[in-house]
């Protein structure tokens, strides 16, 4: 996206702020706007009729959320929760559609974003059949580290903070694992020296080794 287009997009809609744990969008709601995240981290969670909550995705600054329901004119399929202080722009879908019509480079950027999300979803479906539970968890951690990780000063470029705060239940949801299986596998990855764990914090000890173990290519576009 060209700089001028990006600047114009950041001027669309109305600015809004959210404190941690506040819902930006609510599952089932029929509102017709999207949110452009300008700072902070959010989680997308879906609740099944059984009451089970599943983490679907993590989104950061520069991401759109709520676009599926807005474009399709259907109820929201998930709830978006602030993980930190979050700032965003509320953009009505008709205004966004008009903006994208005026700016083909922005349309291409949105299509690339949606394609990346579809690739992520497709990989999780393939992983469910193609890999054992340990590898599946490692692949989720590896791809999260590629997208969000923050290098640590003591790591010579190999050691990094995962970049998002996730519970073990949320990691299990992303990998399609039972909680006890995810806990055992996370302990195994810790014993292998690939990760370190503290309360709701995961450090990747050696990113190249984790990518190799997880069979994830280093130039993953997600």
Descriptions of predicted regions:
Residues 1-22, 65, 69-70:
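Cyclic nucleotide-binding regulatory module and flanking cytosolic helices
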Residues 21, 32-45, 60-62:
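Glycine- and acidic-residue-biased ligand/ion/polar-headgroup-sensing regions
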Residues 24-29:
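Short phosphate-coordinating micro-motif centered on Lys-Gly-acidic
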Residues 41, 85-87, 201:
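Structural motif
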Residues 49-56:
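Short alpha-helix-to-loop micro-motif enriched in aromatics/charged/Gly
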Residues 57-120:
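Cyclic-nucleotide recognition modules
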Residues 133, 144-222:
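Phosphate-/nucleic-acid-contacting segments
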Residues 134-138:
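Short, leucine-enriched amphipathic alpha-helices that occur as contiguous helical runs
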